Amino acid sequence: MKRKKILAAVLAAAVLTGICGVQIVTKRWNVNSCFAGAYPVRGVDVSHHQGEIDWKELSGQNLDFAFIKATEGSSHEDERFQENWRLAGETDLFIGAYHFFSFDSSGADQADWYIRTVGELSGKLCPAVDVEYYGGKAADPPPRKETITQLSLCLERLEEHYGRKPIIYTTYKVYRRYIEGNFEDYPLWIRNVYYPPQLDLAGKWQFWQYRDTAVLDGYKGEEKYIDLNVFSGTREELEEYRIDSSGEQEAQIPGTV
């Protein structure tokens, strides 16, 4: 029996390696796609870079959710947010609006700008805040203490308004410097296009951006690629991230792996 189990494991590994190898050679998928296949709840995130989107066509490609860029800093609105928000809302996708965090603006002002721009979120996914380096910030990272303070103000203001902790999207470098140990009770959406976060962030992530060079049908912008993501839980657990009409939400983080 033990030898049979070992043989089965070896064969499974060989099949997986073969599939991944074919995908690499044909450039249809990257290695991460093999591992992301273990999480069937799949989604995209988009901004004006994808240009005009045919949401009916896009949503029909085995997708469950979409995060749409709404705001950046304390005064910028994505030029395609209103159109994307309206049209995506006519599909069966779970949709959410994300904010691109600025290291150069007041966190409270950024939250207020998001609230004014996006409005009520009844039936939609809770807010997401994208925290990543931009410009020369990676080479010269913003002060840790001040960044944590401003990000806290932004997140707390959003939670106060919408009744639910926002999702934090981030990269590994930013996670290690600002997020880890400070915002552990917030849902984590981690970017890792190289390997599964299950290897070093097991039990800490809920969303995983596993690819940034995917090509789907249904959009025609300056950017030919689109980001692909998976949710760590089931579709029913994803539904727990929706804002209900009363604004009252469960305190726990569903779908944690």
Regions found by a protein language model. Give the residues of each.
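Substrate-binding cleft of extracellular glycoside hydrolase catalytic domains
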Residues: 31, 36-53, 68-153, 159-161
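Sec/Tat-exported extracytoplasmic proteins
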Residues: 62, 70, 89-92, 118, ...
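Functionally critical loop-and-helix segments that line ligand-binding/catalytic clefts
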Residues: 38-51, 56, 183-257
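N-terminal Sec-pathway targeting helices
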Residues: 1-19, 23
